[in-house]
Every structure is written in structure tokens, then in C-alpha cells.
């Protein structure tokens, strides 16, 4: 007998959701044709053969913009459910969310002062 019977559904879901991708990769490996022709080994970009040097170096600016975007995107993910249940949660959760936003604003000011948001 399973001791934590209230978690049966959780463990069943975890096992099934772990087995589905493993089985998909296994079946794909068995059914996929194995061919190492010249077209398979050549590089292409969006279905077009590259002309000249295909390697392009991206500047750190793109990385910094992406990083700042991800930080504020995650902020939105956390703040949206809070805003939807604001009237139920009360003032203490409002203070916690305010502290969270203030920490992110400090991070934004730091990135701004370091020049992470400067394009030129």
C-alpha cells in the first residue's frame, strides 16, 4: 500500500509526463531514416545556402537588452496573478509585492547606470 495515497494522482501524472517525451524520442530514433548525405551535412539558414562567411558575431548589447527584457517579463508573470487576487490577499501581500517591484527597480537603475540600456 502506498503511504501517501493523496499524492497518487501527482505521481501518476509525473510518471506519465516523463514517459511521453522519452517514448517520443525513442520511437523517433527507431523510425527516422539514417542518411548522412552532403545535403544533410551542409549548413543553411532559413532554407537558403549561406553566401560568404556564415558566422556573425552579435554584440553584447543584444544580450543585455534580452536580459533586461526577461527580468521584466518574469516580473509581469509574478505580478499578474497577484493583481487578479489583490482583494483576497490583503495588505501584507501588497507590501511584499511592493518590495519585489522596488528590488526590480533598483536592478533597472543599476543596469541604466552601467550603460546596459545605451544603444550607441
Curated annotation (Swiss-Prot):
EC number: 7.1.1.-
Gene3D superfamilies: NADH:ubiquinone/plastoquinone oxidoreductase, chain 3
Residues that span the membrane, as ranges: 14-34, 64-84, 88-108
Membrane topology: Multi-pass membrane protein
Catalytic activity: a plastoquinone + NADH + (n+1) H(+)(in) = a plastoquinol + NAD(+) + n H(+)(out); a plastoquinone + NADPH + (n+1) H(+)(in) = a plastoquinol + NADP(+) + n H(+)(out)
Similarity field: Belongs to the complex I subunit 3 family.
Protein purpose: NDH shuttles electrons from NAD(P)H:plastoquinone, via FMN and iron-sulfur (Fe-S) centers, to quinones in the photosynthetic chain and possibly in a chloroplast respiratory chain. The immediate electron acceptor for the enzyme in this species is believed to be plastoquinone. Couples the redox reaction to proton translocation, and thus conserves the redox energy in a proton gradient.
Subunit-structure text: NDH is composed of at least 16 different subunits, 5 of which are encoded in the nucleus.
Name recorded for this polypeptide: NAD(P)H-quinone oxidoreductase subunit 3, chloroplastic
Organism: Coffea arabica
Name of the coding gene: ndhC
Amino acid at each position: 500500500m502506498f503511504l501517501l495515497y493523496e499524492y497518487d494522482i501527482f505521481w501518476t501524472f509525473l510518471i506519465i509526463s516523463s514517459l511521453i517525451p522519452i517514448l517520443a524520442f525513442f520511437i523517433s530514433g527507431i523510425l527516422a531514416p539514417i542518411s548522412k548525405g552532403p545535403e544533410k551535412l551542409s549548413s543553411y539558414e532559413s532554407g537558403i545556402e549561406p553566401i560568404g562567411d556564415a558566422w556573425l558575431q552579435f554584440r553584447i548589447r543584444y544580450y543585455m537588452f534580452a536580459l533586461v527584457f526577461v527580468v521584466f517579463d518574469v516580473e509581469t508573470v509574478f505580478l499578474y496573478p497577484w493583481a487578479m487576487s489583490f482583494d483576497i490577499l490583503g495588505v501584507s501581500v501588497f507590501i511584499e509585492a511592493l518590495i519585489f517591484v522596488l528590488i526590480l527597480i533598483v536592478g533597472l537603475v543599476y543596469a541604466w547606470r552601467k550603460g546596459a540600456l545605451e544603444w550607441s
